[in-house]
Amino acid sequence: MSFGKEAIERGTEIGSTENFKFDFKRDIGRPIASDTPDHTRVNSIILSALVLNEFRKRAYVVGQEMGQADGIKDAVITVPAYFTSDQRAATKNAGRIAGFNVLRIINEPTAAAIAYAHTKNAQGNVLVFDLGGGTFDVTIMRVADHAYDILATDGNSRLGGIDFDKRLVGYIMQELEKQGVNMTNLSEKEKIQLQYKAEQIKTSLSVNDQALYEHYVNGQGYGVLITQAIFNEITLDLLKDTEIKVQSTLQASGLKWEEIDHILLVGGSTRMPMIRQMIRLMSGLEPKFDLNPDTIVAQGASILADLIVNNEVSFSEHQDGKTTETDRVVVKDVTSQGIGLLFKKNPNKNYSFVGDYYNSVVVPRNSVLPLAVTKDLFAVVDGQSKFKLRITE
């Protein structure tokens, strides 16, 4: 079993996507399964568990090198801030299947902020812009005296670097067809190679003004020159989606741009120059990327794991946001999704409808945790002894 670039490189050699699984992190916690070569169905929890099990094996080796005979069994696992409760539960379940004792599921932006604050001794209002391979979220938090108060979060669990790759693939195919190349009968191997090269071109455009895609058919060579300007144009709507989320999160936090002290860029996709330029134009600030955007989340998770093991961290317990003598870090979170109840349609009520039901929001998005909410429910008929609650998130 291979992962990441090694898996893609093997795929280009094998020439088959039959046993390839891409971006299943997006589908974890959803009723979606993938087909395997032997036609069995595997859900995203199992696929995630396979990846985590590989991490566990590597951690076992590291643990033995550190003198721990049983290796490393405890784990803190990070997830996108915009994950639902089902996705978080599924991730924790995947960790258990992989053999980990999951100490905590923590939001990736929070982990990144912990790493940055720990390394740079940073304080103040922090905006974390997290664009990974498959997901995107933005979080605004206040960091003061080792307390991390999440003010607002938003995101898109189906937007990431792979979507920018797909735009490149589409553009390359379109340009080659203009040159007379038939792109409708590509082999599986050619499709994998095209996707892999598109990702390489995207990476190259992060440091170069242009990149060339070369394609050969029966010894005849064709080329597509892609400039940063072209790449920016074909992905403009994706960039705009992230900008809208940033602005809405800032509004939800109750802050203004001049009140933001630090902007952290997290995730490999934030290396794209247009991301950094957009942030500069929006905020008037220079985004921070002096810590590796690929590893900053893991750094924060490891710091947090050490604090958890030593009972030096608490989550949302302190309503005043202050640390105690034993707590070196306090994390206060918010609900990333609104939570509501579905009721039968009532034409006199002005709610958002879902089929034959209307959704009544009970807990608005970005509500501070912990919280308690009460809602009065009324029987439809006299003597009604039971009812079904349909909960939305």
PLM feature segments, named:
Residues 48-58:
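Feature captures the FAD/FMN-dependent oxidoreductase FAD-binding
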Residues 1-27, 37-41, 61-393:
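Oxyanion-binding/catalytic loops of NTP- or PPi-dependent enzymes
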